[in-house]
Amino acid sequence: MNDETTPANKNPEKAELRCGWTTGACATAATKAALTALITGEFPDPVGIILPKGEVPYFQLAYEGLGEGYAMAGIVKDAGDDPDVTHGATIISTVYPAPPGTGIIFRAGEGVGTVTREGLAIPPGEAAINPVPRRMMTEICEAICAEYGLPADLVITISVPGGEEIAQKTWNPRLGIIGGISILGTTGVVHPFSCSAWIHSIHRGIDVARAAGQKHVLGATGSTSEDAAQALYNLPDFAILDMGDFAGGVLKYLREHPIDRLTIAGGFAKLTKLAQGALDLHSSRSQVDKGFLWQIAERAGAPAGMKERILLANTAMEVLELTQSIGIDIAGPIALEARQTALKTLRGAPVEVEIIVTDRKGNILARV
């Protein structure tokens, strides 16, 4: 792609990371190109679209195909500087006429998932093409058909070669989206390292669990703590939330959309931050307070002579090992404080909270 297809950062002097385009934006541009070729016999290249917030990006076509009664166009997704697993994937739209009066029908082609569970924005049995991309494609197809005096009765099939393999790196399998990736996007723009997409996936996970009648969900900070909790509960995949560092994303959504029981599992350092009151546990946005750990250790019986060693410790794990070496448990009090943070954030929502603290090997240090 050339510079025409690269989203401009709103303040180039301050922003160093490059934005990209969503799969939904790519699918919309590919659909516009395919429908135009189906009607006129010629592919617009580059092809421009209007995004929901008014941006007008242009995309070069990576693939063109024109046959009897159908047209295909493909665009390589550029996610900018975001570590998006779909970066470099080819988003292909195949368009052909549908029977009169049917309107626009969306189908999942190779590498695009199909929804199988309740609770998502798209009902079971439908292609995993989210509402905003559907609306963008519908509007652009209706406009083109109106321009040529044609009815907007079309079948649009979106395909992503290799999408089934890419989907294994996403939470689609746990959400009950099988066979490939989802076609996503609300603005059309991918903002590098944005938290919003991750938090959105947490919310959709809770929606799916609620729709399935699941009474117990698990949010873990990483795979080690997740495995430790799963060894206890063996919850179904759709009951495991993509929490990571975003404890607040889980708790605030459960506050309005409660599930009977929540288990939060995490390493000692991450849950120390939660115990301190932090809801974003990422190292760039919250840090372990050694003074807080000393207060916990002192209440647990640590001698005054240990204070300086704790305050000067390099990591939370070093503090844990220091206290363990003299037989003092600080993981239990940390779990209790973390639970209090969770309950405070839930603001009385009917959710029972359990905290599991693990070490780096997945051994359970505390469970309250």
From Swiss-Prot:
Metabolic or biological pathway, per its Swiss-Prot or TrEMBL entry: Cofactor biosynthesis; adenosylcobalamin biosynthesis; cob(II)yrinate a,c-diamide from sirohydrochlorin (anaerobic route): step 6/10
Disulfide topology: none
Catalyzed reactions: Co-precorrin-5B + S-adenosyl-L-methionine = Co-precorrin-6A + S-adenosyl-L-homocysteine
Signal sequence bounds: none
Keyword Hydrolase on entry: no
GO biological process entries: anaerobic cobalamin biosynthetic process; methylation
EC number per UniProt: 2.1.1.195
Keyword presence, Methyltransferase: yes
GO MF term (any one): cobalt-precorrin-5B C1-methyltransferase activity
Assigned keywords, A-Z: Cobalamin biosynthesis, Methyltransferase, S-adenosyl-L-methionine, Transferase
Domain of life: Bacteria
PANTHER family the UniProt entry points to: COBALT-PRECORRIN-5B C(1)-METHYLTRANSFERASE
Similarity comment text for this entry: Belongs to the CbiD family.
NCBIfam families the UniProt entry points to: cbiD, PRK00075.1-1
Name recorded for this polypeptide: Cobalt-precorrin-5B C(1)-methyltransferase
Organism in which the protein naturally occurs: Brucella abortus (strain 2308)
Gene name of the record: cbiD
